Amino acid sequence: MAQVQLQGQTPNGSTAAVTSAPATSGGATATQFGNTSLYVGDLDFNVTDSQLFDAFGQMGTVVTVRVCRDLVTRRSLGYGYVNFTNPQDAARAIQELNYIPLYGKPIRVMYSHRDPSVRRSGAGNIFIKNLDESIDHKALHDTFSSFGNIVSCKVAVDSSGQSKGYGFVQYANEESAQKAIEKLNGMLLNDKQVYVGPFLRRQERDSTANKTKFTNVYVKNLAESTTDDDLKNAFGEYGKITSAVVMKDGEGKSKGFGFVNFENADDAARAVESLNGHKFDDKEWYVGRAQKKSERETELRVRYEQNLKEAADKFQSSNLYVKNLDPSISDEKLKEIFSPFGTVTSSKVMRDPNGTSKGSGFVAFATPEEATEAMSQLSGKMIESKPLYVAIAQRKEDRRVRLQAQFSQVRPVAMQPSVGPRMPVYPPGGPGIGQQMFYGQAPPAMIPPQPGYGYQQQLVPGMRPGGGPVPSFFMPMVQPQQQRPGGGRRPGGIQHSQQQNPMMQQQMHPRGRMFRYPQGRGGSGDVPPYDMGNNMPLTIGALASNLSNATPEQQRTMLGEVLYPLVEQVEAESAAKVTGMLLEMDQTEVLHLLESPEALKAKVAEAMDVLRSVAAGGATEQLASLNLS
């Protein structure tokens, strides 16, 4: 018997020996796989890369070794990989080191298959249960190796290393697996009869299980006085019973349920049919097929989700989501606002743990027609100096699905490093217009507005219905001399091009006036826009009124004029991109941002997170999860 001594450093610094076992004829050969990469499992958590290199280095020339670790804690995951220069050395390592203790713990060595389909196919994989506790990986391998080349072999163990009584063996081909099943199923291993059969995933086991053929019966709603003998007497007349037990707690009291196992499945089925609903000691029994815990949990979860969905579908069109509420509005006040449009079954203002209003709430009507009428009449209406946002309430999951569907075709926006002057992109007429450079329609990556996700033209009373074409985007070029070293602009001194956009000259404002922000603004984000005609601050209400008389393109431009300077105060470098993202929100939401510095800062921060994620890759996923409304 060949003995190979592998000397290496133990985790505590002492020297440990790894003693090899004789090579088995059932080991997989290198010529079969032509593989130089090995998987090493069941490693001690203290084994390092260098110690793994020392153990396998005696088998041949090792190219690389790696112990896999948790990304956060850097703790070993208990497995690693070893790469040799030639297949012969890898085959020798499998034959001589498989199941050999490495620093006190037997390791498993097998070929590494990078193609996951090979590992997950289940071909040649068998399941063994009712194993004696003394049978370990090596004993199981030695037992099954005579039927063919074994790819992997494992006995399931708990956290303390004790066998759970079952294991798995995967052969290189299906023929070897079938041969092992035929020869060993029902045989005695260490005086215990074992079951050997094809491996089935849990989903496959559940789907292939014949729920009409069962022998184990579940009984509940038992009286406290019901005993095991009572169950035997009640069920015994339907067939031969192998066991009957009433489940008890630690104090010996009945838990109110039990199990009866029949020898014949037909007898069990007749007992269920006859005794389900039977009264015993004034208790009506429930009798049915005994289920596994996982099966029962799955069934209950499916039933719960179905009931939840049915309830949501029933009230979906009757439940309204209300946003941009004044902090002074209570549940009663919210109900009073919506009551003129129908029967309000419930109204709720959402609050934080301190009782402060979150500015949003829900109103449920008796019928969908009443909810639709309330939404059409109150969307954009000024309540306590704030325009309401009213829409059909959506579940979070449904909203995410809609966002994913909307942005599934959006291509990532590449964030290039800034060179020279900043060139923001937003609709014509934006602040700081220099020489206008038109580039036609916005590219797909600009996230064009779509019905139901962009601005809603009827959120402000009198706003024109229908959506026009996507507005053209342009890049206003800010002159270098107007740029501060820190990326900001000097107050004033911005030269407009001699030829303005005709729409800008004639239709920008109903009274022919432009908006501007006061010079020398500070860090606050709630400075109201100015009407240049009167040099007086333009209130949100007046802005909403002006928006109601403008076309969709003009509305977007007007809001961009007002929003851009506020965004620039919070995020100067990406102000244009962030402004464009915020303008995709509903009109009332943008108006809310204009008067709420805290809300604006939160949305800007959210937009910047998305832009950074897009720059790092995974744009579609980030855009799909973006929720700026």
From Swiss-Prot:
This is Polyadenylate-binding protein 2. Residues 13-25, 492-507 have a biased composition (Low complexity). It comes from Arabidopsis thaliana. The gene is PAB2. Belongs to the polyadenylate-binding protein type-1 family. It is found in: Cytoplasm; Nucleus. A.thaliana contains 8 PABP genes. GO terms for molecular function: mRNA binding; translation initiation factor activity. Keywords: Cytoplasm, Host-virus interaction, Nonsense-mediated mRNA decay, Nucleus, Repeat, RNA-binding, Translation regulation. Coiled coil: none annotated. Residues 539-616 form the PABC domain. Its main location: cytoplasm.
